[in-house]
Amino acid sequence: MSLLSASLTDIGLKRSKNQDSIYSSNEEGLFIVADGMGGHAGGETASNLAVKTIPKYLNENQNQSPNEVSSNSVKKANQVILELGNKMPELKGMGTTVVQIYFKGPFAYVSNLGDSRSYLINKSQLYQITRDHSLIQEKINLNIYTREQAAADPNKNVLVRTCGLEENVDVDVFTYKVRRNDIFVLCSDGLHSKVSDSDILHIVNKNIPDPKKADEKDLHQTVVALVAQANANGGNDNISVILVVAQ
């Protein structure tokens, strides 16, 4: 089984800086989206540190199980970001979301902190793999809110877990057995807050009707179409998306 991918990050229509960072490597089987937060250059610095630290840690710790190294690589990024923030007052309080997929053998190990997401598309069905670490998601989990009520809450962007703000973090890791023709989507909230799950599925299916015949051009035009739709729907935030097809 081989991997085909395409990625794109875009500043959007309302922000003066792009605080998202992405990492994409078919060879390593590693794909990361990080959505930074923090004043001045904090968000850019945090997300950039995450996408540099995680691959380095993974490559240097292949003796660990894929599940362990997926979690520990994010924890290492958390430590690096926190330490730099403590050393440099102008960066204190910076942080980032992280969502990553690490392919090893027949499995995909999906880990996350924050509200950047991973989706799986298989046989024209879309499934959200990750769970947002947000105040809204916690209320949904407790049946306090429906998803419709949550969408209208003014505090919908408040995160309860991020990378770089606290010394100890719990990283969610999901293990999934990959099947041929599976399509994985990683994205920041600049995409999923502006483009519905059904529209994400429609755009992917329209551009990749048959995953086993897809090529790099098909994947590239898909990520371009997803970003364009987020901008057409307001483009309030930076937008990042990575698409991975298992062939």
Q: What name fits each language-model region?
A:
Residues 1-247:
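PP2C/PPM-type serine/threonine phosphatase catalytic domain
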